């Protein structure tokens, strides 16, 4: 299920689908997604280290969270660990405390983490299975708040459109970039980026997820405008760097 949430944007869910396709023991109550991200110093995290950390994190989560849930499943997606909880509405605050406790237990395990840092993003709690996808989106948005809030925290975001949307900074970047690329003026390109950066950081109430989203959009536009042969590989490398960005 969590793998499908990561890779299938058209995924539709219902209580019946959760039971019949994914074999979950769902009950009326609340659904909530959590997302945890590993950030290794120098982005040199090795696959066996990633798995070792995630297996320990899963062990802690399964031991503590399942006591208060109808069902709880986890899935590892590279440097991300996702979990989906289905629990009685009355357990909402208790679940929140347990998730925080589990996260803190893992943060204390320096023997596992070494130089790796963790961040945990909480999705919104939803009543209907069809809204689990929205909780998944919010969990990932919450993780992006580490750009402003820092690592080693349990983070939360809301479902608002944010404050950058009305500033149309991506449109401004596109216009300014066009003239800069026509003249191949490196300094003008650098200035274009700096102007957008400064306007972004000076915007009151800006969220980390908005910044990350804008960086992705501007970066993709820049790559598409470049006259280079392997744009797909360049885009993949850029996306990976965005995933591993921990500060602005």
Regions found by a protein language model. Name each.
Residues 67-69, 105-113:
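Short catalytic/binding micro-motifs of nucleotide second-messenger systems
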Residues 111, 115, 223-231:
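Charged/polar positions within long, soluble alpha-helices
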